[in-house]
């Protein structure tokens, strides 16, 4: 009886171990879905650096079915921006994450 219990326990732990290894292996091959980078143009209306926001009146954005409007975009540590000021006509890229529009980069356009 003791031997049968040992065999059963060994079998159980062997199956659990192989299952854990199989799950770990599959996680290595899975890739996370990359967020869609959306391009747009508009005019800078203001900055709120304390809240890390920039307000832009943007042209219609077909990729997300948005009409022309004024809205705030979130400035992230990865946002590439320099020399942008209120009133500048800009081209910018952002990623939509839930209700947040995360600004990726922005530059003055002609």
Swiss-Prot record:
Q: Please give the function described in this protein's UniProt entry.
A: Part of a cation efflux system that mediates resistance to copper and silver. Binds one copper per polypeptide.
Signal peptide (residue range): 1-21
Q: Which species is this UniProt entry from? A: Escherichia coli O157:H7
Which Gene3D superfamilies would you find in this protein's record? Copper binding periplasmic protein CusF
The entry's protein name is Cation efflux system protein CusF
Q: Which UniProt keywords apply?
A: Copper, Metal-binding, Periplasm, Signal
Show the Pfam families listed in the entry.
CusF_Ec
Which GO molecular function annotations are given, in alphabetical order?
Answer: metal ion binding
Question: What's the domain of life for this entry?
Answer: Bacteria
Q: What induces it?
A: Transcriptionally regulated by CusR in response to copper and silver ions.
How does it associate, per the subunit comment? The cus efflux system is composed of CusA, CusB, CusC and CusF.
Q: Where in the cell is it found?
A: Periplasm
Tell whether Metal-binding is among the UniProt keywords: yes
């Amino acid at each position: 009886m003791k031997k049968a219990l040992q065999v059963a326990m060994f079998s159980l732990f062997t199956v659990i171990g192989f299952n854990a290894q199989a799950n770990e292996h599959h996680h290595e091959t899975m890739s996370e879905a990359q967020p869609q980078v959306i391009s747009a143009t508009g005019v800078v209306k203001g900055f709120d650096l304390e809240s890390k926001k920039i307000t832009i009146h943007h042209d219609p954005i077909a990729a997300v079915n948005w009409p022309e409007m004024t809205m705030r975009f979130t400035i992230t540590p990865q946002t590439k921006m320099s020399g942008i000021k209120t009133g500048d006509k800009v081209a910018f890229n952002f990623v939509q994450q839930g209700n947040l529009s995360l600004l990726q980069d922005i530059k003055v356009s002609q």
